[in-house]
Amino acid sequence: NFTKGSGSSVYIADIDKYTDSQVFPGHVWDGFVDDGNGVNHIDVKNCNIFNFGSGAIVINGTDVHLDNNHIKNIGGTALYLRGGDLETLTPSNNEILNNNIHHVGYLQKSYVPAIGMHGVGIYVAYNDLYDAPHCIFNYHGNDHVIEYNKIHDAVKECLDMDAIYTRNEYVPQWRGSVIKNNYIYNIGIYPVGEYKKQLNVSAIRTDNYGHALQIYNNVFA
């Protein structure tokens, strides 16, 4: 129920809105990508997505649900999801739930998170996210919720970075996001012979005057 676009990418416009229990072995480009015009009512669930040299899933749209997928061995960002209207604050109703995402950014190394988000009202919960040289989350926009995720073994090869990262000094209207009830551990530790601790690493950072956020009930270990 899908067709392949150029470079063997799977274009969202060709998926018939729903992909369930498929296996997508990788190649050098992105995995799922939208057609550039935005899409809506997309479900990708119960899929195994692995060995992509760039991103695994790149979608700009609304009512997008990425649920219970196993994504691994990704050269860049595993999931990049955009959606919602930043002018009217209309939420995207996009969700990223119950995914196992690991071993990301093995080629590009920095600013290629497990999950990148931009827009309004993206909900991310109950994911197991780990093994990244840089950040796990890099998000921008309004009214996102990041909760009940297990985040570990990240920022292994870089300094001055964090497991969950945002910055909004140039766009102070980006506000209202909530980060709560996450379990975050083994950040900035990379085993090279003896364990090495990276410098200036945190679990959560709101960089350069990041503000108007709620951060509570997270566990750090």
Language-model features: locations:
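Extracellular beta-strand/beta-solenoid scaffold signature
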Residues: G5-D35, N51-V58, I74-E87, L107-G116, ...
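Conserved SAM-binding loop
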Residues: N138
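Right-handed parallel beta-helix
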Residues: N1-K4, P25, N37-S54, D63-G76, ...
